Amino acid sequence: LDTTVRKVVIDNLPFLLTDTVGFIRKLPHGLVESFKSTLDEVVEADLLIHVVDISHPDHEEQIAAVGRTLAEIGAADKPTILVFNKVDAYSYIEKEPDDLTPMTRANWTLDMLRDSWMAKISAAPNAPLVPPLFISAATRTGIDTLRSVIYGEVRRIHALRYPYNNFLY
């Protein structure tokens, strides 16, 4: 359950990017201590990039589980970029409304899902500074936008912390 730290430079702005293991529901008891170091990294971070596998059928529950965990460790108010990955693997099977069951309560196209998340985020009382991003790391869809948003957020945080260096970036 190790984290990986790399120096990243976007448009001449250097920062450290820490990749942690994903949040795991019902973590085996023996791994709880190892996972605490990952949570320490999250608490120390200036910006969180929450990457969600949009092709996973329970992605909304996974988002909720991460939200609960962040609240438990006191990191719920950290600036966060919500990134839905694997848009290339998201599948939509057209179904008749009569065929939908409580288990398939939402049978949405990717555009419908995107619109739904945009509405949820904008209506939230502590709405994030940037809307959710929809990308595919495999096909590079949305990667330039992700880079740009990360740069903007890191630059904003850097300018707040070091206003005398603002001219550098």
Task: Identify the function of each model-found stretch.
Residues 17, 51, 83:
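Generic enzyme active-site microenvironment
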Residues 57, 61, 65-169:
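C-terminal-of-GTPase-core extension/linker across diverse P-loop GTPases
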Residues 2-3, 9-36, 54-57:
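Switch II (G3) loop of P-loop NTPases
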Residues 30-56, 68-75, 136:
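Inter-motif core of Ras-like GTPase G domains
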Residues 10-13, 18, 43-45, 75-78, ...:
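Short loop/turn elements that form and flank the Walker-type P-loop nucleotide-binding site
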Residues 4-6, 13, 47-50, 78-80, ...:
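Structural beta-strand/beta-sheet cores of well-ordered domains, especially the beta-sheet scaffolds
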